[in-house]
Design a protein with these regions (language model features):
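Non-heme Fe(II)/2-oxoglutarate
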Residues: 2-103
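Catalytic core of non-heme Fe(II) oxygenases with the double-stranded beta-helix
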Residues: 82-204
Protein backbone atom coordinates (compact mmCIF):
# COMPACT_ATOMS: atom_id res chain seq x y z
CA UNK A 1 0.00 0.00 0.00
CA UNK A 2 1.33 3.41 -0.95
CA UNK A 3 1.81 5.96 1.81
CA UNK A 4 -0.22 9.13 1.36
CA UNK A 5 1.90 12.20 2.09
CA UNK A 6 0.72 15.80 2.02
CA UNK A 7 2.57 19.09 2.36
CA UNK A 8 0.78 22.40 2.89
CA UNK A 9 -2.46 20.55 2.23
CA UNK A 10 -1.28 19.25 -1.14
CA UNK A 11 -0.89 15.61 -2.11
CA UNK A 12 2.74 14.73 -2.87
CA UNK A 13 3.51 12.76 -6.02
CA UNK A 14 6.10 9.98 -5.62
CA UNK A 15 6.47 9.06 -9.27
CA UNK A 16 7.69 11.86 -11.52
CA UNK A 17 10.65 13.26 -13.41
CA UNK A 18 9.66 16.74 -12.11
CA UNK A 19 9.56 18.14 -15.66
CA UNK A 20 6.12 19.63 -16.22
CA UNK A 21 4.50 22.39 -18.19
CA UNK A 22 1.37 24.08 -19.48
CA UNK A 23 0.38 26.66 -22.09
CA UNK A 24 0.20 30.41 -21.54
CA UNK A 25 -2.28 32.62 -23.39
CA UNK A 26 -1.69 33.32 -27.08
CA UNK A 27 -2.00 37.08 -26.54
CA UNK A 28 0.96 36.96 -24.13
CA UNK A 29 3.03 34.97 -26.63
CA UNK A 30 2.26 37.56 -29.32
CA UNK A 31 3.30 40.33 -26.93
CA UNK A 32 6.67 38.72 -26.24
CA UNK A 33 7.22 38.09 -29.94
CA UNK A 34 6.46 41.76 -30.66
CA UNK A 35 8.75 42.85 -27.82
CA UNK A 36 11.66 40.85 -29.27
CA UNK A 37 11.26 42.35 -32.73
CA UNK A 38 10.37 45.96 -31.89
CA UNK A 39 11.72 47.02 -28.47
CA UNK A 40 14.55 49.58 -28.55
CA UNK A 41 15.33 49.72 -24.82
CA UNK A 42 17.78 46.85 -24.42
CA UNK A 43 20.70 45.60 -26.50
CA UNK A 44 20.94 42.11 -27.91
CA UNK A 45 24.19 40.18 -27.72
CA UNK A 46 25.58 36.86 -28.86
CA UNK A 47 24.76 34.00 -26.53
CA UNK A 48 27.54 33.27 -24.07
CA UNK A 49 28.81 30.23 -22.21
CA UNK A 50 29.40 30.88 -18.49
CA UNK A 51 32.02 29.12 -16.38
CA UNK A 52 33.55 30.00 -13.01
CA UNK A 53 35.00 33.48 -13.44
CA UNK A 54 34.67 33.54 -17.21
CA UNK A 55 32.19 33.98 -20.04
CA UNK A 56 32.77 33.59 -23.74
CA UNK A 57 31.12 32.97 -27.10
CA UNK A 58 31.36 29.42 -28.45
CA UNK A 59 28.89 28.75 -31.24
CA UNK A 60 29.66 25.03 -31.13
CA UNK A 61 28.32 25.07 -27.57
CA UNK A 62 25.61 27.71 -27.81
CA UNK A 63 24.62 29.56 -30.97
CA UNK A 64 22.07 32.25 -30.18
CA UNK A 65 21.24 35.94 -30.02
CA UNK A 66 20.12 36.89 -26.50
CA UNK A 67 18.22 39.74 -24.90
CA UNK A 68 18.35 40.03 -21.10
CA UNK A 69 15.22 41.64 -19.69
CA UNK A 70 15.11 42.87 -16.06
CA UNK A 71 11.99 41.62 -14.29
CA UNK A 72 11.57 45.18 -12.99
CA UNK A 73 11.09 46.54 -16.52
CA UNK A 74 7.63 48.09 -16.53
CA UNK A 75 6.24 47.12 -19.91
CA UNK A 76 2.96 45.26 -20.50
CA UNK A 77 4.58 42.38 -22.38
CA UNK A 78 6.78 41.41 -19.43
CA UNK A 79 4.14 42.08 -16.77
CA UNK A 80 1.59 39.92 -18.60
CA UNK A 81 4.12 37.14 -19.03
CA UNK A 82 5.04 37.08 -15.35
CA UNK A 83 1.37 36.85 -14.43
CA UNK A 84 0.91 33.87 -16.75
CA UNK A 85 4.12 32.26 -15.54
CA UNK A 86 2.84 32.48 -11.97
CA UNK A 87 -0.25 30.51 -12.99
CA UNK A 88 1.89 27.75 -14.50
CA UNK A 89 4.11 27.75 -11.40
CA UNK A 90 1.07 27.42 -9.14
CA UNK A 91 -0.01 24.32 -11.07
CA UNK A 92 3.53 22.93 -10.84
CA UNK A 93 3.54 23.40 -7.07
CA UNK A 94 0.17 21.66 -6.80
CA UNK A 95 1.85 18.60 -8.28
CA UNK A 96 5.16 18.93 -6.45
CA UNK A 97 4.48 20.72 -3.15
CA UNK A 98 7.87 19.80 -1.65
CA UNK A 99 9.33 22.32 -4.11
CA UNK A 100 8.01 24.95 -1.69
CA UNK A 101 10.30 23.89 1.17
CA UNK A 102 12.27 27.08 0.57
CA UNK A 103 11.04 30.48 -0.56
CA UNK A 104 12.06 31.58 -4.03
CA UNK A 105 11.42 34.24 -6.65
CA UNK A 106 12.71 35.56 -9.96
CA UNK A 107 15.71 37.80 -9.33
CA UNK A 108 17.87 37.49 -12.44
CA UNK A 109 16.84 39.03 -15.78
CA UNK A 110 14.66 37.00 -18.11
CA UNK A 111 16.50 35.80 -21.20
CA UNK A 112 14.87 36.02 -24.62
CA UNK A 113 16.91 33.75 -26.89
CA UNK A 114 16.76 33.59 -30.67
CA UNK A 115 18.32 30.56 -32.32
CA UNK A 116 19.08 30.61 -36.06
CA UNK A 117 18.52 27.59 -38.26
CA UNK A 118 21.08 25.07 -37.06
CA UNK A 119 21.62 27.04 -33.85
CA UNK A 120 20.74 26.23 -30.28
CA UNK A 121 22.13 25.29 -26.89
CA UNK A 122 23.84 22.25 -28.33
CA UNK A 123 25.73 20.79 -25.36
CA UNK A 124 24.45 19.01 -22.28
CA UNK A 125 24.32 21.44 -19.38
CA UNK A 126 22.60 22.25 -16.12
CA UNK A 127 21.37 25.56 -14.74
CA UNK A 128 23.52 25.17 -11.64
CA UNK A 129 26.94 24.76 -13.22
CA UNK A 130 29.26 27.21 -11.46
CA UNK A 131 29.74 29.04 -8.18
CA UNK A 132 28.21 32.40 -9.11
CA UNK A 133 25.27 33.40 -6.86
CA UNK A 134 22.87 33.22 -9.78
CA UNK A 135 23.82 29.58 -10.30
CA UNK A 136 24.28 28.38 -6.73
CA UNK A 137 20.87 29.62 -5.59
CA UNK A 138 18.83 28.57 -8.61
CA UNK A 139 15.94 26.42 -7.46
CA UNK A 140 13.70 25.89 -10.49
CA UNK A 141 14.10 26.72 -14.17
CA UNK A 142 11.41 27.77 -16.64
CA UNK A 143 11.27 28.10 -20.40
CA UNK A 144 8.52 29.25 -22.76
CA UNK A 145 8.62 28.40 -26.46
CA UNK A 146 7.43 31.34 -28.55
CA UNK A 147 7.05 29.57 -31.89
CA UNK A 148 6.34 26.07 -33.15
CA UNK A 149 9.48 24.18 -34.18
CA UNK A 150 8.45 20.62 -35.11
CA UNK A 151 12.03 19.34 -35.14
CA UNK A 152 13.17 21.46 -32.17
CA UNK A 153 12.67 21.54 -28.42
CA UNK A 154 14.54 20.31 -25.36
CA UNK A 155 15.76 16.92 -24.20
CA UNK A 156 16.79 15.77 -20.70
CA UNK A 157 19.56 13.21 -20.34
CA UNK A 158 18.79 11.21 -17.18
CA UNK A 159 15.04 11.30 -17.69
CA UNK A 160 15.35 10.32 -21.37
CA UNK A 161 12.66 12.89 -22.05
CA UNK A 162 11.97 15.14 -25.04
CA UNK A 163 9.64 18.15 -25.03
CA UNK A 164 8.91 19.61 -28.48
CA UNK A 165 8.93 23.37 -29.03
CA UNK A 166 5.25 24.31 -29.18
CA UNK A 167 4.17 27.93 -29.20
CA UNK A 168 3.17 29.09 -25.73
CA UNK A 169 4.20 25.92 -23.92
CA UNK A 170 5.97 26.73 -20.66
CA UNK A 171 7.98 24.01 -18.96
CA UNK A 172 9.43 24.04 -15.42
CA UNK A 173 12.05 21.71 -13.95
CA UNK A 174 14.68 21.51 -11.15
CA UNK A 175 17.95 23.33 -11.74
CA UNK A 176 20.48 20.79 -10.50
CA UNK A 177 22.75 18.17 -12.12
CA UNK A 178 19.95 15.61 -12.08
CA UNK A 179 18.33 17.50 -14.94
CA UNK A 180 21.12 17.83 -17.49
CA UNK A 181 19.53 18.95 -20.74
CA UNK A 182 20.22 20.46 -24.14
CA UNK A 183 18.34 22.02 -27.01
CA UNK A 184 17.22 19.92 -29.96
CA UNK A 185 18.68 21.75 -32.95
CA UNK A 186 16.33 22.47 -35.85
CA UNK A 187 17.72 22.26 -39.37
CA UNK A 188 14.56 23.78 -40.84
CA UNK A 189 13.60 26.92 -38.94
CA UNK A 190 14.51 29.53 -36.35
CA UNK A 191 13.51 29.29 -32.72
CA UNK A 192 12.56 31.96 -30.18
CA UNK A 193 12.15 31.18 -26.48
CA UNK A 194 12.17 32.90 -23.11
CA UNK A 195 14.09 31.38 -20.20
CA UNK A 196 14.81 32.14 -16.58
CA UNK A 197 15.10 30.78 -13.08
CA UNK A 198 13.56 31.00 -9.64
CA UNK A 199 16.23 31.74 -7.03
CA UNK A 200 16.17 30.84 -3.36
CA UNK A 201 15.73 33.75 -0.96
CA UNK A 202 19.12 32.81 0.51
CA UNK A 203 20.67 34.90 -2.25
CA UNK A 204 19.00 38.08 -0.96
Amino acid sequence: MKEIVTYKGKLCNKESDFIWGDYIEESVVKGLYHFWHHQNILARHEGMVYTDGDKYVDKDYKDSLDLHVPVSLHVPEIHNYLMQLQEVLNKYLERFPFAELSRFEIIEPLSLQHYPIGGGFKEWHTERANSSPGNVYRHLVFMTYLNDVPDGGTEWFHQDKYVPAKRGYTVIWPSDWTHFHRGVVSIHQKNLSLQGGFLSHSVL
